């Protein structure tokens, strides 16, 4: 058992350990044993994998990209005082209601944060966000068309609001 490869194989269980003292005591004829047939293992029958029913974690969106132009029944005006009021904006906009957001009662940091949220909301639901005045914005769903011109003073107000 001086061979290091053999020692490694014995250690890993890939070979049987043969003792040197037994080999020297047995005659050469007794060392050879008759060949015995090894039974082949029978593979177990494969069972069909049982799949559990899948429960969706999120309910599907009710807003479709190409919503049919419907008669506009309402426009929601929101005067948020804190960022937590964004939920009201999101729920109504998701249902296809245009939302006017008046940020005059919010701090500049919270207003900027709310506008970032509203921008992501409008992009995610294929709508648009437009500035009406210095701190008033309009979120319009994809089926609502808004027309108008942007004057030079509105461009200046936009630059001053975002600190450009």
From Swiss-Prot:
InterPro entries noted in UniProt: Cell_div_SepF, Cell_div_SepF/SepF-rel, SepF-like_sf
Keyword Glycosyltransferase appears in the UniProt entry: no
Protein localization: Cytoplasm
Annotated keywords: Cell cycle, Cell division, Cytoplasm, Septation
Region: Disordered, residue numbers: 21-71
HAMAP family linked: SepF
Family that this chain belongs to: Belongs to the SepF family.
PANTHER family reported for this sequence: CELL DIVISION PROTEIN SEPF
Protein name: Cell division protein SepF
Organism whose genome encodes this protein: Clavibacter sepedonicus
